[in-house]
Amino acid sequence: MALPNKFLLWFYCFAWLCFPVSLGSQASGGDAQIAASAELESGATPWSLLQPIDERDRAGLLPPLFKVLSVGRGGAPRLQPDSRALHYMKNLYKTYATKEGIPKSNRSHLYNTVRLFTPCTQHKQVPGDQVTGILPSVDLLFNLDRITTVEHLLKSVLLYTINNSVSFSSAVKCVCNLMIKEPKFSSKTLHRALYSFTFNSQFEFGKKHKWIEIDVTSLLQPLVASNKRSIHMSINFTCMKDQLEHPSAQNGLFNMTLLVPPSLILYLNDTSAQAYHRWYSLYYKRRPSQGPDQERSLSAYPVGEDAAEDGRSSHHRHRRGQETVSSELKKPLVPASFNLSEYFKQFLFPQNECELHDFRLSFSQLKWDNWIVAPHRYNPRYCKGDCPRAVGHRYGSPVHTMVQNIIYEKLDSSVPRPSCVPAKYSPLSVLTIEPDGSIAYKEYEDMIATKCTCR
């Protein structure tokens, strides 16, 4: 027993001697940390604190609002898209979203994602015949690796851009022959078999048209649904001028140089939780809104016998009320020890009231302007301020908020008071350049705070 007792005595002495040293080191370390944080706050802008130090700590440093956008930040230099394709997507963004990036409510489309892909490889062939207007087939390969498993294809379009220097004196009719080439390998012969599909389309374009759109949904939808991310297609164009309007035109001569290699546009529905689901909001906007408050307001006006009984009871209550008022008037108006200003303070809202505050920033401050094309500025807004003791209906707070206030004041001050937090949000439309050079239009849910509450 002597050996264990000596060991315990030695251990306690050692701990007693070391405790002040460790405490002092912790205190000095804490002072240094406070000084460093004060220096950081005084010399740095708020958004410099959002810059991740390490890629592993990015999700922990950035607030949830920017986690979605920070995924595309950094990494290898991005490929720059074609200027014509970028111009088309900018026009699409202006059609679907406001200047502040809020999706327009008058748009009833079901897709929340639009991706534009340019061909990664192209097999050039001999120029087209200027006399017959026939353009030889061109082989194109599109890489669709940016499509995620939660994105479902709704519509696909081939986009041809027209050279601005070309002017049309008459309408031009074109026929497009498209063939999808899908290589497959047999387990026995290991030879590649070529599966082809032919798609014909007739369309016209005139003086004001700068783009030609060809719907190829029926061909690409089964391929994209089967998670095929490499699309090899062969396209042939035959374009001729309208002979009825210009019979003197020699063999319908048409300048084929106005057609540049096409881009592929996919209209997708992102089913993830972070995406904005327009159909969901449209469904709830069209529903008849009659909540429990309306039901209570309807039942507050009795009819028939209930109304007569309520009238008699209100008459008795009125007489009792008069007696109460007369007795109250006989009392002194204000007691000697009563402070009128303190009495009215409980009915006033705090000066620093819970409300929305603006926080306007540009993506250039975050060094994200090299891949976020639109919007240029962003105002996420935030909620800040004190919650009143008696939370009114304008905050839309539940009864639990008032109960929590009572617990804090009367029972246990360790229970936190209700906090000022966002209650409603609006979505945000973002146009970005992907690492592979493709362009993506996406609508994100819950990106701009629009209402505050106390909870």
Curated annotation (Swiss-Prot):
SMART domains in alphabetical order: TGFB
Miscellaneous field: Ovarian physiology and fertility are controlled by endocrine and paracrine signals. These act in a species-dependent manner and determine the ovulation quota in different mammalian species. While humans, and mammals such as the cow or red deer, normally ovulate only one egg per cycle, other mammals such as mouse and pig can ovulate in excess of ten per cycle. The mechanisms that regulate the species-specific differences in the number of follicles that go onto ovulate during each reproductive cycle are poorly understood.
PANTHER family in the record: GROWTH_DIFFERENTIATION FACTOR 9, TGF-BETA FAMILY
Propeptide feature: residues: 25-320
Entry comment on modification after translation: Phosphorylated; phosphorylation is critical for GDF9 function.
CDD domains in UniProt: TGF_beta_GDF9 (cd19403)
Highest taxon above the source species: Eukaryota
Disulfide bonds, paired cysteine numbers: C354-C420, C383-C452, C387-C454
This protein's UniProt keywords: Cleavage on pair of basic residues, Cytokine, Disulfide bond, Glycoprotein, Growth factor, Phosphoprotein, Secreted, Signal
Name the record gives this protein: Growth/differentiation factor 9
Region spans: Disordered: 305-328
Organism: Papio anubis (Olive baboon)
Assembly information from the UniProt record: Homodimer or heterodimer (Potential). But, in contrast to other members of this family, cannot be disulfide-linked.
Entries under Gene3D superfamilies matching the protein: Cystine-knot cytokines
